[in-house]
Amino acid sequence: EMCIRDRCRFMNIILLSGGSGKRLWPLSNDVRSKQFIKLFKNEKGEYESMVQRVYRQITKVDPEAKVTIATSKSQASAIKNQLGENVSICVEPCRRDTFPAIALAANYLHDVLDVKEDEPVVVCPVDPYVEDTYYEAVKELAELAQAGNAGLTLMGIEPTYPSEKYGYIIPKDGDNVSAVKEFKEKPDTETAKKYLAQNALWNAGIFAFKLGYLIDKAHSMIDYKDYQDMFDRYDQMTKISFDYAVVEKEPSIQVLRYSGDWKDVGTWTVSY
């Protein structure tokens, strides 16, 4: 059994790399992206890149995690170079924003990796600088998706200050897992303070669903047969974000509150 009493044996994770997270694009050129520069010291005192750090943390929390990296053609060799030949890579033929990128990766999981439609999948950006507890929360997110009480499960980051950099998730209540009341665009500081008074969480672009949920969504919005067909016609796909195409229209949505340390390297204002 894949999951025994909602405890998942392993996670299916899609890591969005290669500029699907467009906030990173202005900071670095396409090929030598920020996420491959060895900036971070690990416990052994060795320098590692963002991609290496995230991959190491996931496999530490869940040694059997199945990680697929959705990326551009120009970054595929850098990823193999840093993570080894066995890493699973779904290559986007061209940039089409996050909904097509995630739809392509979901169909890749289904058709190429033989992931079943009732298995949970977690999507996260490759650029958070976090403690290992974050990936324990990601595992919990997979378990919530597996339990199937909502179509979509998001991770919301407990804000440390009224930031203008993030969209906000307003939950129905302050519980660890809550239904989502509404989403808010990036606010000014005064508005952000009002959100914080409503238990609001930062929307960090981390979400989970059963694979079949996204395959169905993709078929309802895109005319295609299977992964190969979508890949071949990818350049004809409409550019649309996952938030806009799926998240904001989903009536059945819940959020898991995460209160650990979290820094999003994609919004760092420092430059190296």
Where do the model's predicted regions map?
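Residue-level signal for inorganic ion chemistry
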Residues: 51, 105, 127, 169, ...
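Short beta-strand segments
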Residues: 15-17, 70, 122-125, 154-158, ...
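Conserved core of the sugar-phosphate nucleotidyltransferase
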Residues: 131-228, 233-234
